[in-house]
Amino acid sequence: MEKSWFNFMFSKGELEYRSGLNKAMDSFAPIEKTTIKKDRFIYDMDKNFYGWGERSSYYNNVDLLVSSKDIRNFISDDTFFVRDSNKNSYSIYFDIKKNKFEINNDLSDLEFFFYSYCSSSYLNNRSKSDNDLHYDPYVKNTKSNCNNHINSCIDSYFRSHICIDSYFLSDSTNSNESYIYNFICSESGKIRESKNYKIRTKTNRNRNNLMNSKDFDITKNYNQLWIQCDNCYGLMYKKVEMNVCEECGHYLKMTSSERIELLIDPGTWNPMDEDMVSADPIKFHSREEPYKNRIDSAQKKTGLTDAVQTGTGQLNGIPVALGVMDFQFMGGSMGSVVGEKITRLIEYATNQCLPLILVCSSGGARMQEGSLSLMQMAKISSVLCDYQSSKKLFYISILTSPTTGGVTASFGMLGDIIIAEPYAYIAFAGKRVIEQTLKKAVPEGSQAAESLLRKGLLDAIVPRNPLKGVVSELFQLHAFFPLNKTEIK
């Protein structure tokens, strides 16, 4: 039987939850009153209730955070030593295989909830004798119904208390291999959106096991709210964190729409050439999937017509022309549509004397369009020459991860100021291509933004949080000011 430690800490209506699994209690922090008393309230799942009382419930309206169908994966044959915010300690014993559920006499918050749950969720919805508090025909002498009841009790308790910060310390082969955040879901299928809730995950388990675990399928169902770190595999609410992992600082990919929202003032974005789509100019043939089908599937996935969004807007009140590439659309590859949209954007910025920002995120030229995609490099570079040399206008290039191939070889490195995100992968040829061609190992980190900055290929590395302010100051330094000076931030 494994022993587990729960540390409940209440702060601003939020309970911080931490669990550790270990074979012995010696390795845990000081524990008060951890011995199990003889006088325990016992529920035998093959019999009846013992010790349940009638109390009103105040947990009826809480959101469900733990699914009852998953709770058995988390709790099976375990003793939990629990300490609440008042430092009161008590133990809970679950053994679903042997159909037993026991808690000691020092129940505190958990006892009250189980009392309340049984009286409100089960006893109030049936007829019974006023003198018979143990009679519960809803719970039959079958293993499945009893297990369901235990699951429901635990489920309902966790849905009102479970939170955040979970890490597993067990080296036991019997310890559960799943993270607690896999259970954070509701009956309506939506994850709780409260700003008081964050998820932090610490683990010393093998990362390959985590990557292969099916536990991470949660991001497929809730990717509009939550995003998973590629580096430490923790979950975070992406709207709050701007896709930056708060545990390891790893920068995750952002969509073009998210970057527009990051840089452009609300309500000022005016897109350009939204209806421009590729017509498969060279009739590219593929055995796996026709080019047109790939375009259609990428459009359905991203909601975009191609791998770049262009338009005008205001950045802290300063009118700007902005183009943002989207890596989710066929790897941000540059085809004829991408090249044409960027070219038209630069020409418009030239005519209107607007500062220009291009946010790069691309795998290079799109091979399905052959030499037409390669010609976009020359076309964009040509209009940039007129914009920068003839009109003396200001162009900022922002390189994100990854920026490679034809984009790096053309407009990506032509900015008057070249800014990169931290840890961005920036290269012409990828590491694998170089190693296969030259038969030499590429040093780790040699194609990262930090390495390029040391070699003078970049002007600055700017995190996402201050990026908008930095760009605004650069524009003002080059005599581009807000339309309304009160909008300066």
UniProtKB/Swiss-Prot annotation:
Pathway: Lipid metabolism; malonyl-CoA biosynthesis; malonyl-CoA from acetyl-CoA: step 1/1. It is an enzyme of class 2 (transferase). GO terms for molecular function: acetyl-CoA carboxylase activity; ATP binding; carboxyl- or carbamoyltransferase activity; zinc ion binding. The keyword Chloroplast applies. One of its GO terms (cellular component) is acetyl-CoA carboxylase complex. It catalyses: N(6)-carboxybiotinyl-L-lysyl-[protein] + acetyl-CoA = N(6)-biotinyl-L-lysyl-[protein] + malonyl-CoA. The keyword Nuclease does not apply. It holds the Pfam family Carboxyl_trans. Keywords: ATP-binding, Chloroplast, Fatty acid biosynthesis, Fatty acid metabolism, Lipid biosynthesis, Lipid metabolism, Metal-binding, Nucleotide-binding, Plastid, Transferase, Zinc, Zinc-finger. GO terms for biological process: fatty acid biosynthetic process; malonyl-CoA biosynthetic process. Binds 1 zinc ion per subunit. Its cofactor is Zn(2+). Its EC number is 2.1.3.15. A zinc finger (C4-type) spans 229-248. Residues 225-489 form the CoA carboxyltransferase N-terminal domain. It is found in: Plastid, Chloroplast stroma. Disulfide bonds: none annotated. Zn(2+) binds at C229, C232, C245, C248. Component of the acetyl coenzyme A carboxylase (ACC) complex. Biotin carboxylase (BC) catalyzes the carboxylation of biotin on its carrier protein (BCCP) and then the CO(2) group is transferred by the transcarboxylase to acetyl-CoA to form malonyl-CoA. Belongs to the AccD/PCCB family. HAMAP family: AcetylCoA_CT_beta. Acetyl-CoA carboxylase is a heterohexamer composed of biotin carboxyl carrier protein, biotin carboxylase and 2 subunits each of ACCase subunit alpha and ACCase plastid-coded subunit beta (accD). This is Acetyl-coenzyme A carboxylase carboxyl transferase subunit beta, chloroplastic. It comes from Draba nemorosa (Woodland whitlowgrass). The gene is accD.
